[in-house]
């Protein structure tokens, strides 16, 4: 039995979780189905920013050489995707990458991961031209959208420069050349614009980045970096030497970056985690970034809730990578489910991860209580918030991949209320076949292509399991019981019963007029 406490010192359920969402690449935002999927997401989840790769990829056709060898710029594609995002209520979180071929010169091209995407990762032949590209781009945005709007956007320099697959020149070249040239170019347009980095993998180089900017008077308004749960097995072979308790690597990395900024020369910098998703593992021998079913299955729903609750007070934003399985970085998804990272699959069917965010979106108000870690069974947690007398609770039972058998979590919770009387209790649950359709697809035989009725069945399986207890009596407390199997999530909403709905009332005079008109019609 758990007795939830009312603690007004816990703060409010923040919007950190919903400040940003990611899309694979800028070019994908030219596709109507990508925009349609974002519209579905925005209709229910309401993110504020959208971040994506490849703004300067050659498929965006932003720069070329004219007949005299001078740089010529064209912003049509970027304008189109920016307009689309703004129409959906999304502001751009621009990642300034990759390197256009026109800036590289006559050298062998280096392509980042995956090679098939043709993302050029060479250094520019002349860093002044890199700065010019950024300045002309930002200047165009201000001309088109106005400074008051553009100063609310973010400009992040590059993507994961600490990985050779994305920036072979290394961190020294990033810190001393790539970032400074871009940052000064942004600020040349207006000092009110926000620029930052280092956009590293694994929360690395944040402290070094800040100190380098301070030492050399390089502009910086925020820090950004990435983390994935599976990262622990990349850093620590079979977790040997890992300082993190089982299941706490992800939140631990967030805390380390939070501390690094707090202890730096610029302790008030915003912290943005511009990539994360539910990719997890249980061994260093079989790490996979492209065939990991944790992004499709009901595991993902519990993973989202567990990790977002653990970090929502440790940063300014955290962007799920990515919105939709319309994602071409490693080749377009080739089946209904393909271990692609989207909240929606290629048909726009909602995964467990989408539903987890939907339940988290319902959580609002002052945080009453949050319980996890050593106080509960491994992998379990619960959080409650209250607003205007309505109490909202979310609980999860995450089966960590290292655990072979996760017990059911049978619980009774005692919830304090302000008034005695009758309450209604409404629940929504993510489970296999209800809020998680991946398992239903597997039961179908995992077909590569599906019929219309199969698609409808999967959409139905993607709907959560709802329940209601219409009358629960309270004497200072409401008692609620639930059962969660492995990787299930439940949302519970408790509110005072309202007055019974009144029937439609028609006055005697109006009724007489109606009857008289009916009689006339019969004649």
Residue ranges and their predicted role:
Residues 37, 231-287, 307, 313-325, ...:
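Glycoside hydrolase catalytic-domain groove-lining segments
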Residues 45-245:
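Substrate-binding cleft and catalytic face of glycoside hydrolase catalytic domains
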Residues 449-523:
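C-terminal beta-strand-rich structural cap/linker in extracellular carbohydrate-active enzymes
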Residues 377-421, 426-443, 486-495:
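Carbohydrate-binding surface patches
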Residues 275-406:
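Aromatic/acidic polysaccharide-binding cleft in carbohydrate-active enzymes
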Residues 20, 85, 137, 155, ...:
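Conserved, mostly hydrophobic/aromatic
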Residues 1-48, 486, 496-523:
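Mature N-terminal, pre-catalytic/accessory segment of carbohydrate-active enzymes
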Residues 28-42, 205-213, 301-307:
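Short, acidic/polar
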């Amino acid at each position: 039995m758990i007795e939830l406490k009312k603690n007004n010192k816990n703060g409010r359920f923040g919007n950190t979780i919903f400040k940003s969402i990611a899309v694979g690449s800028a070019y994908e935002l030219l596709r109507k189905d990508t925009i349609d999927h974002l519209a579905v997401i925005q209709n229910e989840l309401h993110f504020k920013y959208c971040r994506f790769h490849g703004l300067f990829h050659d498929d965006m056709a932003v720069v070329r050489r004219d007949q005299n060898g001078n740089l010529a710029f064209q912003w049509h594609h970027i304008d189109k995707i920016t307009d689309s995002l703004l129409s959906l209520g999304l502001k751009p979180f621009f990642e300034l990458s990759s390197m256009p071929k026109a800036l590289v010169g006559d050298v062998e091209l280096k392509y980042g991961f995956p090679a098939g995407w043709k993302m050029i990762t060479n250094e520019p032949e002349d860093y002044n031209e890199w700065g010019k590209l950024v300045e002309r781009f930002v200047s165009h945005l201000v001309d088109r959208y106005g400074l008051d709007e553009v100063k609310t956007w973010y400009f992040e320099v590059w993507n994961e420069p600490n990985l050779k697959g994305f920036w072979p020149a290394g961190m020294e070249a990033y810190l001393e050349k790539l970032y400074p040239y871009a940052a000064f170019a942004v600020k040349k347009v207006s000092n009110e614009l926000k620029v930052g980095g280092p956009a590293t993998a694994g929360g690395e180089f944040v402290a070094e980045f800040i100190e380098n900017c301070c030492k050399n008077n390089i502009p910086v308004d925020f820090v950004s970096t990435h983390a994935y749960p599976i990262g622990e097995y990349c850093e620590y072979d079979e977790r040997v030497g890992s300082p993190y308790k089982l299941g706490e690597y992800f939140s631990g990395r967030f805390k380390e970056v939070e501390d690094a900024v707090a202890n730096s020369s610029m302790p008030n910098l915003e912290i943005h985690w511009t990539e994360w998703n539910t990719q997890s593992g249980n061994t260093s021998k079989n790490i996979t970034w492209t065939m990991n079913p944790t992004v499709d299955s009901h595991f993902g729903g519990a993973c989202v809730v567990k990790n977002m609750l653990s970090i929502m007070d440790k940063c300014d934003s955290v962007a799920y990578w990515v919105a939709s399985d319309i994602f071409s970085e490693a080749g377009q998804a080739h089946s209904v489910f393909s271990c692609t990272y989207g909240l929606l699959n290629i048909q726009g069917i909602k995964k467990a991860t989408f539903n987890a965010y939907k339940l988290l979106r319902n959580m609002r108000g002052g945080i009453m209580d949050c319980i996890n870690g050593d106080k509960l069974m491994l992998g379990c947690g619960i959080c409650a918030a209250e607003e205007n007398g309505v109490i909202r609770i979310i609980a999860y039972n995450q089966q960590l991949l290292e655990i072979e058998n996760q017990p059911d979590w049978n619980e009774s919770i005692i919830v304090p209320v302000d008034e005695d009387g009758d309450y209604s209790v409404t629940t929504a649950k993510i489970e296999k076949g209800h809020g998680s359709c991946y398992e239903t697809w597997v039961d179908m035989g995992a077909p590569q292509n599906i019929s219309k009725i199969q698609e409808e069945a999967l959409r139905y399986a993607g709907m959560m399991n709802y329940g209601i207890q219409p009358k629960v009596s309270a004497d200072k407390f409401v008692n609620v019981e639930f059962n969660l199997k492995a990787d299930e999530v439940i949302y519970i909403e408790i509110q005072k019963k309202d007055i019974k709905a009144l029937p439609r009332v028609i006055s005697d005079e109006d009724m007489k007029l109606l009857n008289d008109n009916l009689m006339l019609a019969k004649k």
